[in-house]
Amino acid sequence: MKEFDLESYDYYLPKELIASYPVLPKEKAKLLVYERRSQKITHTTFEHVLDFFPKNALIVLNDTKVIKARLFGSKHAFLPSKTTEVFFHRFFKNNTALTQIKGKIKVGDKIFFDANYHAEVLELLHNGQRLIAFYDNKTPLNQENILKLLEQYGHMPLPPYIKRADESLDAHEYQSVFAKHMGAVAAPTASLHFSQNTLEKLLKDFKHAFLTLHVGAGTFLSVETKDIREHQIHTEVLRIPKKSQEILQKSQEILCVGTTALRSVEYFKRLENPNQEAFECDIFLHFANPILHVNYLLTNFHLPKSSLLMLVSTMIGLEKTKEIYKTAIEKKYRFYSYGDGMLIL
């Protein structure tokens, strides 16, 4: 079936449509609304997004907060040039961290961030990740202090298709206005469209629930297997508070703000009698594992051959997805993280 063929999810995108900066004010970003029942497409802007939200739907939002995950250091304590990049992925056991480090590296190597702080490479993992520990002189840092180090010395982890260094505006624009729990290394991008004013109106007028999926670096990876069913998707840390779990269990109609919220809901709703708040989410949604519990989705426009494009295709069909993306390109919609959005009803 073509739905399982990786090449079915390829498309050409002119480079000028890859958004390098956000639209400001946020409400001026374009929004494509697609109503599946009537197959009607409406072109509007985010200042009208809540007008299209179904009144009885539960709105689910991901309140993860992006950390400054990119660090630059030197392999020698007294060298002023910091040319070794460390990309923090997530915490591991005993206050260690999973990272990617550019360039040649071996176990025992140290990377210095200033006169006091450094990291030591503990293990080279098979998937290209490096297990490291952070230190203040000879004292190991705990998770709280590692986050403080990242906040002080780190850079916002802009996606690889944004071909510029991070700037001061990214510290707040590559972060949703309701971001709360630190841990993501990529923003849940549909959330970026909400201004404080739009959020307050949503919280006042709609049933809503928050969850936290710490978006991992794997979100940018293309699927590589010719048959998409053979793809092993990345695992991400998910937390759903008991209050949100209760609301989700009772709700019949759900609208997710972003694919991360949708994947979280689908993962949770398939569990039998969940009795905890913390999970490891590794759900991959495609035509052989379709969406079962979410009715509507607000999302951005996604990369070719990405698992997120496959997710969207399961909601509206492969051919309709291609047709809508073609329309968006013709109408000069801006794509990817800082781009415009699409509401599927």
From Swiss-Prot:
Coiled coil segments of this chain: none
GO terms of molecular function: S-adenosylmethionine:tRNA ribosyltransferase-isomerase activity
Catalysis performed (reactions): 7-aminomethyl-7-carbaguanosine(34) in tRNA + S-adenosyl-L-methionine = epoxyqueuosine(34) in tRNA + adenine + L-methionine + 2 H(+)
Pathway: tRNA modification; tRNA-queuosine biosynthesis
Alphabetically ordered keywords of this record: Cytoplasm, Queuosine biosynthesis, S-adenosyl-L-methionine, Transferase
A single GO cellular-component term on record: cytoplasm
Gene Ontology biological-process annotations: queuosine biosynthetic process; tRNA wobble guanine modification
Intracellular or extracellular location(s): Cytoplasm
EC number: 2.4.99.17
Record has Cytoplasm as a keyword: yes
InterPro entries: QueA, QueA_dom1, QueA_dom2, QueA_sf
Keyword ATP-binding: no
Pfam families: Queuosine_synth
SUBUNIT field: Monomer.
Function: Transfers and isomerizes the ribose moiety from AdoMet to the 7-aminomethyl group of 7-deazaguanine (preQ1-tRNA) to give epoxyqueuosine (oQ-tRNA).
Family: Belongs to the QueA family.
HAMAP family the record matches: QueA (MF_00113)
PANTHER family: S-ADENOSYLMETHIONINE:TRNA RIBOSYLTRANSFERASE-ISOMERASE
Entry protein name: S-adenosylmethionine:tRNA ribosyltransferase-isomerase
